[in-house]
Amino acid sequence: MGKLTGKTALITGALQGIGEGIARTFARHGANLILLDISPEIEKLADELCGRGHRCTAVVADVRDPASVAAAIKRAKEKEGRIDILVNNAGVCRLGSFLDMSDDDRDFHIDINIKGVWNVTKAVLPEMIARKDGRIVMMSSVTGDMVADPGETAYALTKAAIVGLTKSLAVEYAQSGIRVNAICPGYVRTPMAESIARQSNPEDPESVLTEMAKAIPMRRLADPLEVGELAAFLASDESSYLTGTQNVIDGGSTLPETVSVGI
């Protein structure tokens, strides 16, 4: 029996990248899945997982819109019955210098990376409180709260905010049986990382990914499935005494003082 057998997990931004990795990992550990994404293509992933014998429901919603989120969750619960686990994974990153970034681009990050998490959590949490049981996994980043790169001010702002939200919710709802923990990935080989590489060097994005890997002590980017395993641990009873934590999964990238000094 898998560590998530009998549990139903709602995963946002589940179509690709880390979200897809979490979905596939949770399915392997026995969870019933509700896959939420803004793209109707999420139906294809749900169909694939169902075809492999997993229980899976796809819902299309825009996390920026509370009404859209509420309607999607209502549809999902009509089929799945309840939500035991929430993974707030949906997020975006657009590069741009602080002075050149438009208010629209700033708000694009805030609306999805902060307000989207707020909206989904607010829609799911009351049911968890009523049952006095729930696990919430927040997708933050090493960027923002620990390190920063030029051109990622808006992204860093929002991911640091998720750490604060994680800790606040963990304290506020600990006695309601709710555990809230954050994952802080370094670079993961995802469409988002590839987009950052294209924005950094449109003519040779692969070289950017290569340089990313060189700066990591383990000399590679993470696989989304590796982040999925950490999320599964935080969503399972194996982490029953963990709440309000930041769980770094970065191959050691935040450890070196510099990449130019040493043996």
UniProtKB/Swiss-Prot annotation:
* Domain of life the protein comes from: Bacteria
Q: What's an example of a GO molecular-function annotation for this chain?
A: diacetyl reductase ((S)-acetoin forming) (NAD+) activity
Short name of any one Pfam family annotated for the protein: adh_short_C2
- Under which main EC class is this enzyme filed? oxidoreductase
Name the EC number(s): 1.-.-.-
InterPro entries noted in UniProt: NAD(P)-bd_dom_sf, SDR_fam
**Gene3D superfamilies, from UniProt?**
NAD(P)-binding Rossmann-like Domain
Q: Where does NAD(+) bind?
A: 10-32
Q: Is Oxidoreductase included in the keywords of this UniProt record?
A: yes
Enumerate the SUPFAM superfamilies for this protein. Answer: NAD(P)-binding Rossmann-fold domains
Active site located where? 155
Give residues annotated as binding substrate. Answer: 141
Record's keyword terms, sorted: Oxidoreductase
Is the keyword Transmembrane helix assigned to this protein?
A: no
Q: Which PANTHER family match?
A: 3-OXOACYL-[ACYL-CARRIER-PROTEIN] REDUCTASE, SHORT-CHAIN DEHYDROGENASES/REDUCTASES FAMILY MEMBER
Which family does this protein fall into? Belongs to the short-chain dehydrogenases/reductases (SDR) family.
**Could you identify this protein by its name?**
Oxidoreductase UcpA
Species of the source: Escherichia coli (strain K12)
